[in-house]
A protein has these predicted regions:
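Acidic, proline-/serine-/threonine-rich low-complexity intrinsically disordered repeat tracts
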Residues: 7-29
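N-terminal pre-Walker A segment at the start of P-loop NTPase domains
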Residues: 26-62
């Protein structure tokens, strides 16, 4: 007698499967409207390409005269964005041997500073006492000496009162300041608001460009003013990724763009 096989289990009806669909692309990520802003590569649009093709680059020139009055210059940009290269050009071209120049940087003895004029004083620490001494000297000599203090990535003095005075009042004592920072928030808002010239170089984060560069400074200037925010940021990244840079002359309410190769003349 052959063994009896157990009955096959009853087939359960299959649960209805939801149709598989690809996740929808967010509106700001549609083809031609999406920019991978966290990468070096930035997608473009015909509008952005047209703006770039018609941009007029200006010869680099700053409206500063240290013999007449002090100035305040800020250079913002990520690491490796040629901020120090530009600083050296400014010191050589605008602050003569008659200007007493002090450079303060944590790595002040690095090779990048080797080609600066020997007359430039150097220190690896910013000290408020130096600012006070400059002010005292010019107070006693009727503003005889033009001074300039250059601070390269001095990141821990945001709330220093004497640093703030360099932007607020000490320009009247013929004391100028040039400060280089990787983060716009590292400069106190009152100092940012009183800078004469603000220079913008490359940033790596799209949100930084949107929240600080655009919303605080550039969004209402040509070539950005008529673009939606994603395109403003993309245009900024596309230009500054080539190390071009923007100069905002606050006093004259003027924005210009400059080509990096000019700095290598």
């Amino acid at each position: 007698m052959s063994p009896i096989s157990p009955p096959e289990p009853e087939k359960q009806p299959e649960e209805p499967q939801e149709p598989k669909t690809e996740p929808e692309t967010p509106q700001n990520e549609q083809e031609g409207d999406y920019y991978n802003l966290m990468d070096v590569s930035v997608k473009s649009t015909p509008e952005i390409d047209n703006i770039i093709a018609n941009l007029k680059f200006s010869k680099f020139h700053l409206e500063v005269d240290p013999d007449e009055t002090g100035s305040s210059i800020v250079i913002f940009g990520s690491s490796k964005s040629y901020k120090t290269t530009l600083l050296k050009r400014i010191l050589k071209d605008y602050y003569s041997e008659d200007t007493i120049t002090l450079l303060s940087a944590p790595n002040v003895h690095a090779k990048i500073y080797n080609d600066l004029p020997k007359e430039i004083l150097r220190t690896d620490q910013y000290k408020p006492e130096i600012v006070k001494a400059m002010y005292y000297i010019n107070k006693k000599t009727d503003n005889k000496y033009p001074f300039v203090i250059a601070l390269d990535d001095v990141i821990d003095k945001k709330n220093d009162g004497d640093l703030e005075k360099l932007f607020l009042t000490l320009r009247n004592a013929k004391i100028s300041v040039i400060i280089l920072l990787q983060n716009i928030q590292l400069l106190k808002s009152t100092s940012r608001g009183n800078a004469n010239i603000v220079i913008f170089r490359k940033f790596n984060q799209a949100n930084v460009i949107e929240d600080y560069v655009m919303k605080m400074y550039l969004q209402n200037f040509y070539p950005f003013r008529d673009l939606k925010m994603a395109d403003k940021v993309a245009l900024y990244m596309k230009l500054t990724n080539n190390h071009h840079f923007f100069v905002l002359d606050v006093i004259n309410n003027k924005l210009t763009i400059h080509m990096e190769p000019e700095l290598r003349e």
